[in-house]
Amino acid sequence: MFCPPIEEQLAIASYLDEKCGKINGAIDVQKKKIDLLNELKQTIITNAVTKGLNPNAPMIDSGVEWIGQVPEHWKIKRTRFLCNIQTGDKDTVNREDDGLYPFYVRSPKVERINTYSFDGEAVLMAGDGVGAGKVFHYANGKFDYHQRVYNLHNFKDVSGLFFYYYILNKFRYIIEEGAAKNTVDSVRLNMIQDFWMTIPPVSEQQNIVKYIDGEISKIDAQISKANRRIELLNELKQSIITEAITGKIKVC
């Protein structure tokens, strides 16, 4: 092992502290940018699915505290009247790394499996674990899903994508309300069935979804750039450390 004199070791340590400190600062800037961009996404979705795209639309009180005012021509309905709900019959051990179909479990990661039990448009929600009521997926095609994942499908009066964006953004209020009373470690069927949704006319839903898709696409592109900058900064930091401790650059 190469071991420079103690004076040189101290000089290298001081050099690395300065250089790495600046790089870490730049990384923190990018991480904060990503946090702000994710907050912006949530704000865009919230405003679009509860207020619509017309800022001059007449508003009325929804009667639901966490929804607030909505355009007066929108409807308010509970989820039980908007879709069918069922759970899967598979466990995580059924996954196959090279499986033919998506396998929705209780985490943001989509696994693979060689079977499918559903073919169509659906919104999947984690029913328990750390992702309970917080992990959602939109699917349209053949897939399988975990026994503690809710499959919301056969949508009525609401498009699948509008439903997805709404519940992705708003179901957290149900979780927070439950957490204020006790620990929420699972989502019960009645919590989904009794969940209130705003329902614009179908044509308006389509315009809202198109708007959200476009805005999120632009934001995700910025997030990807920020993540790439973080990768490059970490690579630069590692390169500087390697060169300094192997004597490839002179620091004193």
Predicted regions and their residues:
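A short glycine-rich beta-alpha junction/loop motif
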Residues: 1-10, 143-150, 180-206
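Positions in alpha-helical segments
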Residues: 21, 62-65, 147-150, 190-194, ...
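Residue-level recognition of specific faces of alpha-helices
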Residues: 36, 66, 183-186, 191, ...
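Non-catalytic DNA-recognition/assembly elements of restriction-modification systems
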Residues: 6, 10, 62-90, 94-105, ...
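Amphipathic alpha-helical coiled-coil/heptad-repeat segments
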Residues: 4-57, 198-252
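Non-catalytic, well-ordered alpha-helical scaffold segments
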Residues: 42, 98, 160-164
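Short Ser/Thr-interspersed hydrophobic loop/turn segments at strand-loop and sheet-helix junctions
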Residues: 79-91, 101-112, 116-134, 140-149, ...
